[in-house]
Amino acid sequence: MLKLKFNEEGLIPVIAQDYRTGEVRMLAYANEEAIKKTLETGYAHYYSRSRKKIWKKGETSGELQKVIEVRVDCDEDALIYVIEQEKDRACHTGERNCFFRDIEGNKVEKPLPFEVLPRLQDVIREKIERKEENSYTAKLVSQGKERVFQKFGEEAVETLIALMKGEKEEVIYESADMLYTFLVSLSVSGIDIKEVMEELIRRFK
C-alpha cells in the first residue's frame, strides 16, 4: 500500500464519490485505523473530529456506503472512497449529498451532466412505481412493455432522421427523447443503466 501523508492530527481527507452517478456525496476524514477498517470490511469508516472516534457511515441511519475502490491523489494526502450509497442519502440533513448549496447558499436543483442518466432513471422508476396519474412515463408503461419498446424505436428513427439532416439542435432534441425512452425501456426490463456503463468499461481500451 502507498505511504499516505496524514496531517498533524493523524488524519487524511476522504471524498466519497458515487460509483453509479459519479457525484461527490460527502467529505470526511479518516485516520489509519479507519482506513484499515474500511479495507477489511468493505464499508466506509471515518474518524469524527468532534467525537474523537472512528465511525462507520450509516451504522445507525442505515445509509451505509459500500466501498468499491479506494483511490489516492497524486500527493498521497487525500483519498477517494468510490462507494455505492445505500438509501440514496449521504447527508445528515436528508439530502442525497452534502454539497447541495452553491456559494451564495442557494439550493442546487440540477445534476451535473455526468449524473443525468442514472439520476433520470431513478426518477423514471419512481414515476412507474407510484403510477402517477399525470405522468407521461407512467401512462406509457401502463400500455405494456411492447409499447414502451415501440416508442423507443420510434424515437431512435427520429434521431436517425435528424442526424441525416445534419441539424444540430434537432439532433440534440431527438437524442434526448431517445435516451429518455431508452431508460424507460431499461427500467421495465429490470436493467440499471450502471450495468450498461459497466459493459462499456469492460470494452474500454
UniProtKB/Swiss-Prot annotation:
Record EC number: 3.5.4.19, 3.6.1.31
Amino-acid biosynthesis as UniProt keyword: yes
InterPro entries to which the protein is assigned, alphabetical: His_synth_HisIE, HisE, PRA-CH, PRib-ATP_PPHydrolase-like, PRib_AMP_CycHydrolase_dom, PRib_AMP_CycHydrolase_sf
Entry GO MF terms: ATP binding; phosphoribosyl-AMP cyclohydrolase activity; phosphoribosyl-ATP diphosphatase activity
Gene Ontology biological-process entries: L-histidine biosynthetic process
Region feature (Phosphoribosyl-ATP pyrophosphohydrolase): 117-205
Catalytic activity: 1-(5-phospho-beta-D-ribosyl)-ATP + H2O = 1-(5-phospho-beta-D-ribosyl)-5'-AMP + diphosphate + H(+); 1-(5-phospho-beta-D-ribosyl)-5'-AMP + H2O = 1-(5-phospho-beta-D-ribosyl)-5-[(5-phospho-beta-D-ribosylamino)methylideneamino]imidazole-4-carboxamide
Enzyme class: hydrolase
Gene3D superfamilies assigned: MazG-like, Phosphoribosyl-AMP cyclohydrolase
Pathway assignment: Amino-acid biosynthesis; L-histidine biosynthesis; L-histidine from 5-phospho-alpha-D-ribose 1-diphosphate: step 2/9; Amino-acid biosynthesis; L-histidine biosynthesis; L-histidine from 5-phospho-alpha-D-ribose 1-diphosphate: step 3/9
UniProt-listed HAMAP family: HisE, HisI, HisIE
Protein family membership: In the N-terminal section; belongs to the PRA-CH family. In the C-terminal section; belongs to the PRA-PH family.
Protein name: Histidine biosynthesis bifunctional protein HisIE
Organism taxonomic ancestry: Bacteria, Pseudomonadati, Aquificota, Aquificia, Aquificales
Gene name of this polypeptide: hisI
